[in-house]
Every structure is written in structure tokens, then in C-alpha cells.
């Protein structure tokens, strides 16, 4: 379900044109309700909220929805250079560098996060909305992170994540030569009771599925493209280590840290459906310099 017509953002309001078959109904309110829920795909939770807050109104043949209200960022804006890979009124995709988390931990520390940088970007753009990351990346993993810029987008994208409709393609450089027969790793992942930060393959863990899309081999290492079907903490790192091919630089899971200093893992592509229009959006994130150098280094890939 999606909206295929024209739309305009006017301040806090989104204006849609449902068409004469809806606008001309004797009971326009009920016709609009059915159209929003059954054709556009608006989550019923949000529809009820907008109705309660008088956030739905007709203006001529246009149906207006308050989808862009003023909201606190939810995190302090802290300026940090931010590479924006994609942006419209509903979504933002930021390219996360290595060395920062997407969001803070429960201790509420002062460490800079990607959320802080996104809040500062919103502030500089004159946008007042909550910072809403749809997924996360490990601190030292690079690549695209998807943000919803309003509650409607958040509800739709969260649903798509749960239903595994958002594709995340990663590039990883691992130790050893991965053989062609290894195409899917379906092994549950749980916490390692002996190490606070580690995860491990565990029969009592949560289902975790990683698909290997392609393999390029050198004498010492392999370059993999992988797609996550699930999104468990450290999933690619745990799965590849368990298969005997830890990521280069990933000392937490048995990788040799000396030539790189972090796990050689980069989110290369993010593919999702636009929350309003349903248009398929594919975002490519350029490789960081350290990954490019590692790829070109003849010690690993030639």
C-alpha cells in the first residue's frame, strides 16, 4: 500500500489529493479514513492519534495531515561533519564513519554519536523533529544509517524492518579463502556469558541468518558481499568467526588486528521502499579510505 499521487509539504501539513471518488462522498470523513488505512497504508495507531489531535482536515479537494509537527530532537545537537547520502521530507540516510556509535548507551555518557550529528544537521537546516534511527551499525562499522524524519515514516519503516523488507548489503574482508559452497549461514546468536561485549553462536539464542552473495579470493583473504536477513548484534562478525573466517581487524572475534585496527566491515548498499510513495530507493555508500587501502594491499587481495 502506498500513495501514488502528487503531494505537497506546507509547514506542519502534508497535502494529498485523494481524487473525486473520495472527496465527493457524502461522508467524506469515513471515505478518507478508509482511503488512508486501506489504500495509502497509514498505520491505524497514527490515524487515531491524528483524529484525536485534529490533525486531519479537508481543504477543498485536498486532504491535509499534520505529519510534520514541531518535536524536540531527543538528543543534544553536537556538530560533527555529516555525509548525507539521501534525503527527502520523510527520510534521511547518513554515512556513518568508524569510531562513533549510532546512539548512546544507558549510562548517558558524553560521547559523540551519529544521533548527535544528525540533530545538529536538523538544527542547521531549520528542522525541528525527533531523531529517529531505524537501525544501527556497530561503532567501528561504516556505512548508511536510515533515519525517519516524522512519526509516519518511523512507523512504516519500523514495520518494514520487522517484515525484512529493508535490504542491507555489506562488504567484508575476512581471513582465509571462503569456499563457493558457503552461501547462507543460519545459526542462532546469543550473549557470551564469559564476556560482556561478545556474542556467540548459541542454540538458545535468537535466529540469525546471513546470506553470502559473492566471494572474491586472494591468497590470504576473501572479499565478501553479504546480506542480512536478520539484524542481531555483531551478526556478520559472529557468523564469519564461527565459520573460521573472522573479519580482518576484528580482535574481539579472533581476527588479526595488527594490519587494520578495526573490523573490516562496511555497509555498502541500503535498499528500502519510500514510506509514502512505495518507490524503491537504493542508496550506495562509498568505501572509506582504510577499506580501500586494505582491498588494494597485495598482502590481502590482489
Predicted regions and their residues:
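The conserved catalytic core of RNA pseudouridine synthases
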Residues: 127, 133-158, 187-243, 267-302
Amino acid at each position: 500500500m502506498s500513495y501514488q499521487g502528487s503531494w505537497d509539504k506546507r509547514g506542519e501539513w502534508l497535502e494529498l489529493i485523494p481524487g473525486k471518488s473520495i472527496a465527493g462522498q457524502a461522508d467524506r470523513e469515513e471515505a478518507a479514513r478508509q482511503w488512508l488505512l486501506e489504500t495509502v497504508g497509514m498505520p491505524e495507531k497514527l490515524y487515531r492519534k491524528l483524529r484525536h489531535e485534529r490533525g486531519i482536515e479537508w481543504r477543498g479537494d485536498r486532504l491535509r495531515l499534520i505529519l510534520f509537527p514541531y518535536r524536540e530532537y531527543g538528543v543534544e545537537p553536537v556538530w560533527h561533519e555529516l555525509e548525507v547520502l539521501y534525503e527527502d521530507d520523510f527520510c534521511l540516510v547518513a554515512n556513518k564513519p568508524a569510531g562513533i556509535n549510532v546512539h548512546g548507551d544507558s549510562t548517558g555518557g558524553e560521547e559523540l554519536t551519529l544521533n548527535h550529528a544528525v540533530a545538529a544537521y536538523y538544527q542547521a537546516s531549520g528542522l525541528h523533529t525527533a531523531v529517529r534511527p531505524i537501525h544501527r551499525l556497530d561503532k567501528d562499522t561504516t556505512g548508511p544509517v536510515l533515519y525517519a524524519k516524522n512519526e509516519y515514516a518511523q512507523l512504516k519503516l519500523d514495520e518494514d524492518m520487522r517484515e525484512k523488507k529493508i535490504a542491507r548489503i555489506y562488504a567484508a574482508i575476512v581471513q582465509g579463502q571462503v569456499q563457493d559452497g558457503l552461501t547462507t549461514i543460519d545459526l542462532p546468536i546469543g550473549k557470551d556469558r564469559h564476556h560482556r561485549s561478545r556474542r556467540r553462536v548459541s542454540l538458545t539464542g535468537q535466529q540469525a541468518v546471513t546470506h553470502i552473495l559473492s566471494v572474491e579470493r586472494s591468497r590470504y583473504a576473501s572479499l565478501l558481499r553479504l546480506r542480512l536477513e536478520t539484524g542481531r548484534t555483531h551478526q556478520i562478525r559472529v557468523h564469519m568467526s564461527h565459520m573460521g573466517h573472522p573479519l580482518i581487524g576484528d580482535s574481539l572475534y579472533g581476527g588479526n588486528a595488527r594490519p587494520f585496527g578495526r573490523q573490516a566491515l562496511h555497509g555498502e548498499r541500503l535498499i528500502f521502499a519510500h514510506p509514502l510513495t512505495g518507490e524503491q530507493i537504493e542508496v550506495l555508500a562509498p568505501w572509506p579510505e582504510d577499506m580501500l587501502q586494505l582491498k588494494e594491499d597485495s598482502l590481502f587481495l590482489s
